[in-house]
């Protein structure tokens, strides 16, 4: 199975453990990838994958699991003594971090109430394909970042990060379980699909104690 790093190292380990406990004779190869380098699942021996973002491969069945909210964050040290920015125009003037998988040189934010959208260019000081590296760089005060709310929640609770322009958010990212079309699906895949779908709201929902930030 192919899983994005952030989910594969954290939130999906518990259901994977339950799956293995329920099926004692089962073995799982757990591959962590944030890109989509594998195109032929059958040739690669891959049963299924968790994909974040829009599924564009017409050869894959895509089961929607959730949408992950994304917010704008930065370290207090980056902001100095001033008030955290409240509007997108203020964000454009700050140093930025980029998560190459989802944004590089441009950011678009949507107002949570009015639905109004604002788009502006950024010149990242730091660019990465790792959500963990992005969060760490943000905590160190390197720049402003856009990341999954569940991923940033612990650092927000500890005061290592603050949310900027809280009335504005980046578009949520869809999370899907995907697998190739086939005439027959093995029982191991059907059981895993059942488990993930039954726990999707818990797995991909908000972090406990995040207070909606």
Predicted regions and their residues:
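Central regulatory/effector-binding core of bacterial HTH transcription factors
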Residues: 1-58, 209-213
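Short, well-ordered beta-strand segments
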Residues: 1-2, 49, 97, 145, ...
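Hydrophobic hinge/microswitch elements
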Residues: 119-163, 170
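Acidic, Gly/Pro-rich loop/turn segments at junctions of secondary structure
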Residues: 31-127
């Amino acid at each position: 199975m192919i899983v994005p790093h952030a989910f594969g190292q954290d939130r999906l380990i518990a259901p994977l453990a339950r799956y293995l406990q329920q099926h004692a004779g089962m073995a799982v190869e757990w591959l962590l990838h944030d890109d989509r380098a594998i195109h032929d699942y059958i040739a690669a021996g891959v049963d299924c994958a968790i994909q974040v973002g829009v599924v564009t491969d017409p050869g894959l069945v895509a089961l929607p699991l959730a949408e992950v909210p994304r917010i704008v964050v930065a370290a207090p040290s980056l902001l100095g003594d001033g008030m955290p920015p409240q509007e997108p125009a203020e964000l454009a003037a700050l140093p930025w971090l980029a998560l190459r998988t989802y944004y590089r040189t441009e950011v678009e934010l949507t107002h949570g109430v009015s639905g109004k959208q604002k788009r502006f260019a950024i010149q990242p000081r730091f660019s990465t394909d790792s959500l963990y590296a992005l969060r760490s760089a943000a905590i160190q005060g390197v720049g402003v970042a856009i990341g999954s709310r569940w991923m940033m929640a612990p650092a927000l609770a500890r005061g290592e990060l603050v949310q900027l322009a809280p009335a504005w958010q980046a578009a949520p990212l869809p999370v899907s379980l995907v697998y190739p079309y086939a005439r027959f699906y093995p029982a191991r895949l059907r059981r895993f699909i059942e488990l993930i779908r039954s726990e999707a709201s818990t797995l991909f929902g908000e972090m406990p104690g995040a207070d909606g930030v």
